[in-house]
């Protein structure tokens, strides 16, 4: 466990001792539940804190070491009291909840303005970090043995047993003490991805993993239990269900520059347990909830005991244990039952959690008693007229005040995903040097794996700082700046959620995008196959938007084994930006200069040599390549180890399940190695089932797709549904294809049937017109503007779940009906080697359908021109309520 020296060092930490004194002051005062009085106490204490800071600034050179240290101690205690009052005591008051509501009185609104100003003052304080550093560096026991008059020795020696108030952080020493002495009444909650938890976590009797992407700040404790833990082992679910039976709950996560999202989610979960535990109220039973100071890495550095959890990939089928699946439960990333429209991309285009501009509420505490000063009246009156406030006592200027130690985060601009600059392709054009040796090729489908990277981060809107006099100090006005733009990740400072958060990636004042931009693309030598696919793919507004607002950058995974380290994604984004610049906000018949996508084509050629020269290629193959390549660049799980093959027992168990359930499990298994916005937008799944005609034994495999290839019957004319009938029909295997039945132990007459088990948000249908000999079937396949594929979706759920699984698996949008509207058509005339590709694309209500032939484009001549016998690839988008 914790080493003796490290324990002693933590035990005599002056910050812990002084925090205990501040806690004691707050606990001893229970005189008022009035929010106005509590705010007055905070302002009085703030004045005292600022006076101490002023003393240090004015007189520090003339003070003796003991006098100086005493002032630093007083300053820290005053600050800590304000911290507890503002972030814990006041949010627990009944008046605070009513003041936050939409029907709050004017007086309550003014109180909230003052409260927010106090919070902002805490967040912007730049002196407290220096105070902490000084107290630790100049501790009397360290520099002047015997001079301990400043220190309360009894408090010091008992620090490990004096736990702070609920909602506060505790040290590694204190957690170690709880584990040793109260292990049976202690619950640990690890807020890290399941893979990291399984690899190593704190050793304790009761420890569970709640993945940071599985909950959001609007959840209650019951929603965490029912939704966030749906894929957790039954043992962990049972532990969380018994959360009201413990005396202590400690939440911890990984604390580092790269895990700020985890740290933010730790605060969100703390808020849920302390203020939204409606199913099992923890406050009523006096259960203390803490966070672990310095997190899991701090525990490991102090040699805290850890253990590893090993999981078998087929545990879901054998025991109902879904923990190895690492479900990516992003809020609303896939639409839920009852979605009236497809809104689920909002979080991917924005941030991880949907912040609602609420003030972070923490646990109930009591107030300290301080002598009143007349400053509150001035502040309150000032707030009425100017929404700002003043305090009579002086304070250090904001430039001198620092965030508290809980928020030693890097600058925001350092939080974006850093990926290598792509090669200067233009230089290579000029020098005719094509190879980009540093780019790793994407040679196959994205079936690789990882330790899940942080999926989404939550930006905090920069605040417009308007200063008004507060004595000689300053207060800050919490108004979003109209020009502010969301940075990459949150910087959690104090245990408090950021104010004025945005729920969408587009800023409040960001101009609306014209996602139906229209521009031609130059043919660079048989590149029509590329041009038509680009035009068709960009009919998907969600895809265009994440590249136009650059949110894709935050999802680039440098560790993805099959990715190009962002090269393909970056050059695709540049192309989309260029097309948008030339083709957006144009009048219906206004023409513009065509775009030459030469750099994008060279990037594609550097990744896959098939697209390097000027030979004609199959547009469907390019579409598959582009989607796979973008997926691998943005694959959040691209470095995970591959899933183990199912055991024979697990396969038998899977065959007993309905395809609806088995396919859902396989989809979750797939997401542990492949998770990206491309998956969410375009990927579906089908089942391939072999069946022995002698004994009836079956074997089913599940395959994902982003482009669904359906056969075209050799008839004079057919409908697209005929192609789906052909795709899903029972096929009798020939003599040379007989299946070796595991039950009969020999090859037997057998059949094969494909069943669509997951229909994606955007369905790309490839009409297989070419056979193995490259002969083309030119039959006119009729396809509608509105396509209903509900009858082809596996809907065979019989109520059975794997043993041990009591809750349904996530639907992830797989709720009928499945209706699609036609968005685009890639057409082909001629042979595979000597033909030409063009595109029909729906450019929205204002522009209507357009025909694209490389550089030229025009509105279609009549309503049905886009229903062409030359159709080769169809692009459909799912619609609701039609």
Swiss-Prot record:
RFU1 is an inhibitor of deubiquitination activity. Residues 182-308 form the Rhodanese domain. One of its GO terms (molecular function) is cysteine-type deubiquitinase activity. One of its GO terms (biological process) is ubiquitin-dependent protein catabolic process via the multivesicular body sorting pathway. The keyword Hydrolase applies. It is a peripheral membrane protein. The keyword Hydrolase applies. GO terms for cellular component: late endosome membrane; proteasome complex. Residues 382-411 are annotated as: Disordered. Its main location: cytoplasm. It is an enzyme of class 3 (hydrolase). SUPFAM superfamilies: Cysteine proteinases (SSF54001), Rhodanese/Cell cycle control phosphatase (SSF52821). Ubiquitin thioesterase that acts at the late endosome/prevacuolar compartment to recover ubiquitin from ubiquitinated membrane proteins en route to the vacuole. Also removes ubiquitin from soluble proteins targeted to proteasomes. Is essential to maintain a normal level of free ubiquitin. Required for promoting coordination of DNA replication and avoids DNA overreplication. Belongs to the peptidase C19 family. This is Ubiquitin carboxyl-terminal hydrolase 4. It comes from Vanderwaltozyma polyspora (strain ATCC 22028 / DSM 70294 / BCRC 21397 / CBS 2163 / NBRC 10782 / NRRL Y-8283 / UCD 57-17).
């Amino acid at each position: 466990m914790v080493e003796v020296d490290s324990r002693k060092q933590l035990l005599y930490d002056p910050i812990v001792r002084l925090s205990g004194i501040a806690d004691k002051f707050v606990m001893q005062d229970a005189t008022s539940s009035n929010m106005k009085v509590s705010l007055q106490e905070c302002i009085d204490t703030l004045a005292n804190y600022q006076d101490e800071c002023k003393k240090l600034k004015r007189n520090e050179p003339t003070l003796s070491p003991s006098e100086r240290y005493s002032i630093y101690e007083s300053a820290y205690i005053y600050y800590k009291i304000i911290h507890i009052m503002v972030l814990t005591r006041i949010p627990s008051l009944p008046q605070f909840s009513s003041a936050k509501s939409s029907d709050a009185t004017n007086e309550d609104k003014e109180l909230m303005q003052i409260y927010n100003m106090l919070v902002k003052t805490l967040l912007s304080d730049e002196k407290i970090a220096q105070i902490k550093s000084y107290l630790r560096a100049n501790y009397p026991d360290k520099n002047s043995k015997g001079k301990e008059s400043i220190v309360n020795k009894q408090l010091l020696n008992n620090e490990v047993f004096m736990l702070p108030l609920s909602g506060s952080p505790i040290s590694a020493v204190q957690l170690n003490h709880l584990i040793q002495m109260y292990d049976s009444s202690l619950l640990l909650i690890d807020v890290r991805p399941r893979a990291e938890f399984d690899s190593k976590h704190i050793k304790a009797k009761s420890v569970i993993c709640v993945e940071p992407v599985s909950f959001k700040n609007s959840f209650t404790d019951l929603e965490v239990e029912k939704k966030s833990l749906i894929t957790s082992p039954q043992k962990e679910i049972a532990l969380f269900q018994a959360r009201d039976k413990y005396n202590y709950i400690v939440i911890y996560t990984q604390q580092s520059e790269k895990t700020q999202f985890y740290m933010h989610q730790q605060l969100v979960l703390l808020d849920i347990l302390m203020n939204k535990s409606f199913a099992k109220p923890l406050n009523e039973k006096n259960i203390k909830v803490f966070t672990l100071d310095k997190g899991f890495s701090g525990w490991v550095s102090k040699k805290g005991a850890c253990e590893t959890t090993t999981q078998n990939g087929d545990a879901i089928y054998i025991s109902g244990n879904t923990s190895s699946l690492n479900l990516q439960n992003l809020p609303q990333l896939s639409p839920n039952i009852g979605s009236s429209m497809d809104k689920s991309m909002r979080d991917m285009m924005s941030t991880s959690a949907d912040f609602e501009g609420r003030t972070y509420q923490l646990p109930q505490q009591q107030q300290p008693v301080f002598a009143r000063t007349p400053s509150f009246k001035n502040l309150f009156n000032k707030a009425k007229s100017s929404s700002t406030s003043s305090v009579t006592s002086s304070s250090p200027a904001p430039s001198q005040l620092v965030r508290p130690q809980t928020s030693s985060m890097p600058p925001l601009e350092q939080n974006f995903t850093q990926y290598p600059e792509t090669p200067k392709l233009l230089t290579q054009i000029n020098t005719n040097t094509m190879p980009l040796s540093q780019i790793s090729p994407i040679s196959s489908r994205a079936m690789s794996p990882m330790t899940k990277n942080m999926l989404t981060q939550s930006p905090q809107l920069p605040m417009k700082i308007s200063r008004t006099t507060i004595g000689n100090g300053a207060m800050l006005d919490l108004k979003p700046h109209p020009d502010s733009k969301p940075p990459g990740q949150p910087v959690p400072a104090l245990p408090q959620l950021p104010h004025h958060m945005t729920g969408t990636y587009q800023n409040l004042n960001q101009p609306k995008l014209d996602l139906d931009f229209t521009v031609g693309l130059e043919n660079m030598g048989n590149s029509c196959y590329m041009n038509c696919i680009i035009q068709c793919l960009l009919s998907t507004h969600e895809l265009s938007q994440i590249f136009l607002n650059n949110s894709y950058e935050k999802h680039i995974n440098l560790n993805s084994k099959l990715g190009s380290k962002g090269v393909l994604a970056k050059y695709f984004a540049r192309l989309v930006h260029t097309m948008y610049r030339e083709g957006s906000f144009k009048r219906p018949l206004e023409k513009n200069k065509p775009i030459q996508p030469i750099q994008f084509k060279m990037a594609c050629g550097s990744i896959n040599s098939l697209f390097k020269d000027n030979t004609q290629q199959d547009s469907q193959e390019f579409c598959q390549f582009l989607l796979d390549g973008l997926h691998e660049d943005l694959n959040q799980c691209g470095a995970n180890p591959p899933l183990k093959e199912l055991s024979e027992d697990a396969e038998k168990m899977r065959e007993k399940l309905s395809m609806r359930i088995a396919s859902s499990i396989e989809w979750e298994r797939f997401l542990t190695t492949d998770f990206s916005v491309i998956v969410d937008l375009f990927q579906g799944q089908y089942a391939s089932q072999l069946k022995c005609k002698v004994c009836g034994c079956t074997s089913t495999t599940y395959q994902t797709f982003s482009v669904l290839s359906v056969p075209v019957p050799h008839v004079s004319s057919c409908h697209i549904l005929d192609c789906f009938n052909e795709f899903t029909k029972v096929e009798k295997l020939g003599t040379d294809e007989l299946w070796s039945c595991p039950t009969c132990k020999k090859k037997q007459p057998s059949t094969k049937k494909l069943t669509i088990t997951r229909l994606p948000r955007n369905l790309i249908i490839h009409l297989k017109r070419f056979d193995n000999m490259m002969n083309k079937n030119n039959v006119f396949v009729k396809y509608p503007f509105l396509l209903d594929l509900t009858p082809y979706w596996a809907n065979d759920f019989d109520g059975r779940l794997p043993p041990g699984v009591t809750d349904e698996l996530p639907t992830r949008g797989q709720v009928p009906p499945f209706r699609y509207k036609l968005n685009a058509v890639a057409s082909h005339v001629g042979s595979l080697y000597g033909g030409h590709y063009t595109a029909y694309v729906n450019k929205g209500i204002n522009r209507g359908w357009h025909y694209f032939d490389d550089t030229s484009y025009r509105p279609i001549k009549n309503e049905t021109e886009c229903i062409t016998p030359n159709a080769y690839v169809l692009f459909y988008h799912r619609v609701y309520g039609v």
